Amino acid sequence: EDPQSESWAFPFFQKVDSINPILNPTQSLSFTDPITNSKVFWEERNVLNPAAIVKNDTVFMLYRAQDQWGTSRIGLAYSTDGLHFEKRATPVFFPDQDPQKTFEWNYRKEEGVPYSLDCKSCYFDGVEDPRIVQSETGSYIMTYTAYDGKTARMSIASSKDLIHWEKHGLILKDDKYKDYWSKSGSIVTQRMGNQQVAVKIKGTYWMYFGDTNLFMATSEDLI
């Protein structure tokens, strides 16, 4: 295929092993968790599963980070060359004392089950695996996984600056589907200039999602 021709695909990826990994956990980064009101080293365990978008000639990477107990929060890093990234010191998106806490906070914590180092995954929870697109109005739409220790549920949030986010709740709100295991929502986009922008197809936004299986969902307003 002619590499100059129009295509839906992004060809010619090349690993740059000389600088990989481009992000590592920084064990000294801390912030005050709004639920426990305690100091947390929010990415001391892992950094993984990022999403990226270009704004003003800068690559902004939203990435999942885990603390010692496996609570996931979303951090933000930026780069002017797409290879070397600088992190913000605190997460931009995290479980909070809000209506989404029931889906983002491990049920064991609510039941008072004591922490144990013998179970490294018992307390996994939080906000995971961001996917981001720009809307036609210029705002940013992020799908993410809310995890309460039992069920992964796709959720959605929006932002005008990639730092301050508004949560809009579960994507699959219907009682029939809201407790189904769902994650990894990828909204269909179209290239507009140098941006990938969410686009309606025959009047509807479309989203692929799923991990072990692939499904589709539709929306009239991206929310």
Residue ranges and their predicted role:
Residues 128:
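Acyl-donor binding region in acyl/amide transferases
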Residues 1-125, 133-223:
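Beta-rich carbohydrate-recognition and catalytic domains
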